[in-house]
Amino acid sequence: AGAAVSQVWTNNVEGVKCNTQTSTGSFQNCQDVSTGEVDVAVATSDVVLNAYNGTGKFADIGKLDNLRVIGAVYTSVLSGVTLKSSGLTYIHDLLGKRVAVGPAASATENATLAAFGGMGIDSSNTSLENLGLGDGADSVGDGILDAAFGFAGLPIGGQLNLAATKEIQVLDMTQEEIDKVLAGNAAYIQTKIPAGTYTGQDNDDKTFGV
C-alpha cells in the first residue's frame, strides 16, 4: 500500500517526489515516523493507537504522541485458516496446537494475540510461530503447523493459495470473544469474512479488523 500511495503522490502532486523503503511493518513504521527517520508511513490503526498511548508493545518505549493520522487505505481483517481435515472450527480450538501468528512485532501478531488474549491461549500452552503470511499458510498445507493467521485486506494471498490446493476451514469466533477483543482496543471493529472469500468457504465467519 505504501509504495502505491507514494507513486500516486509522485505522479499527481506538483513538487512532490516520494522515495520508498521496506520495513518490518506497523511497529517499526510508527517508531520511524516519530523519530523523523521517515516522513510518512503506513500502519494499522490498532498499532497506531497503542503507539500514541504508549500501550501494548509500546509500553516500554513510551507514548509516541507526535504521530498524526492523515488518511486510511483499506480494512485489514484477522483471518485464521486450518485444514478442514483438522476438525478445528473456532480460534479457541487452537489451544495446545502449532500456530503461525505472523512475523514478530507485526500487525498480524498483534491482532492474533489480541484474539488469543480472551481465550487463555498464549506461548505457555500453545506453540506460537513467527512466520510471514505466505510461509505460515504453506506450513499449514505441508502439515507442519495446525493453523496460520493473517491481518490484511481480504482475500489474503497465502491463504488464497492454500485454499486452491487444499480443503481449508476458516476459523470462526463467538460473539462473546469478539466483544472481549473490541473492549480491549478501541481501534477494532467487528466484521466478517464473507462466504466464498476462499474456495470451499460456505458460511460467513465472525472476526474483527481495523
Where are these regions (language model features)?
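Short, flexible turn/loop "capping" segments at secondary-structure junctions
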Residues: 72, 91-93, 206-210
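Structural recognition of the beta-strand scaffold that forms the well-ordered cores
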Residues: 19-20, 39-43, 69, 79-81, ...
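Residue-level preference for short coil/turn positions at secondary-structure junctions
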Residues: 34-36, 76, 95, 210
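Pocket-lining segment of extracytoplasmic ligand-binding domains
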Residues: 45, 56-57, 122-210
